[in-house]
């Protein structure tokens, strides 16, 4: 049983043992708190301490470390085009932003379809591609 409270969809959820556990550990499983109180101006939504969203591993850890909302994370990936990230287990990832019709990155020697973790559609004809890295890439 995940919840001991009668109604988890209330502001007080963040103060329950379950709410605290989710807040502190959800990123390890690919989830983020969707609407953070300090991000209301960015998301347009008030804090919802019960509203967790699956964004995947390693994205949730990266977003949590950098205190990024989903909107900020997507914009960051779009600006950077590619980031490299090592998670708390020592797994290394390359995360790319790709637009339909711009497949240069897929032709690049860096991209390896055998190491593909996932492809997430983030908008019309926009994608985030995540792949594992070998240790040798950083050596």
Regions found by a protein language model. Name each.
Residues 1-86, 94-107, 111-138:
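Cell-envelope/glycan interface and biosynthesis
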């Amino acid at each position: 049983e995940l919840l001991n409270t009668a109604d988890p969809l209330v502001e007080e959820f963040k103060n329950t043992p379950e709410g605290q556990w989710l807040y502190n550990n959800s990123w390890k499983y690919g989830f983020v708190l969707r609407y953070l109180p300090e991000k209301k101006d960015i998301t347009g939504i008030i804090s919802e301490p019960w509203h967790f969203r699956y964004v995947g591993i390693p994205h949730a850890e990266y977003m949590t470390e950098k205190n990024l909302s989903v909107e900020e994370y997507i914009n960051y990936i779009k600006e950077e085009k590619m980031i490299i990230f090592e998670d708390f287990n020592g797994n290394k990832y390359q995360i790319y932003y790709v637009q339909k019709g711009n497949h240069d990155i897929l032709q690049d020697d860096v991209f390896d379809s055998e190491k593909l973790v996932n492809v997430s559609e983030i908008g019309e004809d926009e994608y985030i591609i995540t792949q594992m890295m070998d240790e040798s890439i950083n050596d």
